[in-house]
């Protein structure tokens, strides 16, 4: 059972919303109309020639008026959503049996009439029957929690106890209990959770009357996660399981209830998050075909699982789903080995659903798809009902393609939130496997209106004219203005006068050290770093960095010292680059912490390491490096030609609009929705800081939000210090201790100064010049070739590359 893992929002009423947008090409006049969005060739028109999907899955969203509703544990029984309420924070808030009617949109809550003597009760698993009665596995603790007994209980729909029995002996006190299921005959299956170890993992079997039958092991030492269940026939249940940490396949196991064993039906079942069975009428069922609806505890009855028309579901036995798509799948008939690959039906985002947080998927009597979503971080907890509708009958939207590398759940959440908020535009996230794939897609003119700038070399793409200038949009925005942002944020993403992107949050990476090493220099230059390294031959110049990483950092900040893109001249055979290679050769090939090895602070204290990489996600992070370098600590920056701009800014949720997009106005609306500070401005200070720390996981770009955060930290630390309390410490394995203190305004100012002089991070390992260096330099590092020979090879290869790409 999932735990109550976040402070609930205020109780909200049932909320209905219906969207009817489909990602399809608009008519020839499908531009934004007047304003900034006009002109250009729409990248999305590239998909107009592709076959339009015949079906659209139009969503309707419901929210149950219960702040203790657990969408992750809801079970569909007919047209009723059944669940056990989550444990409340207040004393005396017992869990209740809850039923929400999808037809009447009514919530019924029933208290349990417990027959147990123990007062401290914990429901750790449950399964509802077709008649809305429920089986529970209950942990019952003594008053001091020193004793534990386990019970299998059944309650009728009104909360009256029908039966209970002590199952402590067969289930044990230390076993890890997961989900439950009830098959078509009412028999009970209790699964161990994914935390069960080795041979302890398995299934406890109980008859429909609750009598213990056996425990059947999964028979593997690997971690086992139960994905879902389906009835293979009236006589047996099949369980889909995932074995190991990163499995390529799932396995389908048939439970032989009477034989007390598991039979492997399919060892290479698709690797999925969940599955849903399409119930067929007896006349349609073939030998070995599945015959009942899947849901943990959903059971089987003609009333609750009447088959939808095949026209609505397609010719499939099962529907499967993962983070991004829903698939149709034909399970092979009994005794047959051949199977078809899953067929993609639709993407979750097509229906404004973040598939990373789908908890359950099933089919209603009328053929609609039932989906539950529980995303605490983005406050998206709901039931979605999807109606299969012909695309031609759906009002079209203007579809915008957002190109991203390995777009994650957070990006999907932004797209879903935007798509639900309005009817004119839709964001479709297009994933690319690597930055190289993305760059190639841009080069070949693939459809895209927005680009996720995470790790992207914006300077290089700007030279190719890829981006639209965002400043005119920002200046005309009704909700944002240039002065709203922390000083330096807009400058960081302004390339040759063009504002490429605006992050909603950021983190910083720079080099920290003893500022006295710099002499009179304001910042660390490449020349000065090489001199310092030469003067300290026994010391590692920068701690905890590999050769490849060091070369990438140096090229990120100093590539222009060796390439003149205007003239095409390259200088990789120069004495300066040879000195760089000698410098990089002092770093390790890999980072391995050996037993008993001294910590980085101790090495710095002893002079064995001169500088350290500094990561800054909050203003107080500066104190760690003050603890390493003492009173003369400073953020000196990565080495650059003139000692300025030596800080990397890692952007959160920064998006650029492509110059070829016809829907620039719609693309800007999406960016506005990401940056809009209204919600954060309405939060109480403590809630705001919590949100920044755990959701942004970085520093906010909006100045008002940054100021409120810093004010809270300063005041909170002042109050803490006034009470005479300490601020904690960081202890290393060798005993070195860094003590923390109350945050100071000077430390905040240090962080803000770094922002003013930062440059956007990009993934240098995807840079073609860095790749060439990485391929050739190891021959020098390993002593296979001379420094001069390797430098000449790099010079020739890079020169050829520059000549081809100028």
Where is each model-derived feature located?
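Conserved N-terminal structural module of periplasmic/extracytoplasmic solute-binding proteins
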Residues: 21-91, 95-104, 120, 126, ...
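Extracytoplasmic/periplasmic substrate-binding proteins
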Residues: 100, 589-672, 677-682, 687-696
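Helix-loop-helix "hinge/cap" segment bordering the ligand-binding cleft or interdomain interface
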Residues: 101, 156, 213, 494-596, ...
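Extracytoplasmic "Venus flytrap"/periplasmic binding protein-like
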Residues: 424-485, 494, 517, 603-604, ...
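Short helices/loops that flank or line small-molecule/ion binding pockets
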Residues: 436-451, 459, 531-535, 589, ...
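Hinge/lid segment of periplasmic solute-binding proteins
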Residues: 458-510, 524-528, 632-639
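Short, solvent-exposed loop/beta-turn-alpha elements that line the ligand-binding surface or hinge
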Residues: 471-484, 560-581, 637-648, 756, ...
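C-terminal capping/gating helix-and-loop segments adjacent to ligand/active sites or protein-protein/ligand interfaces
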Residues: 649, 716-798
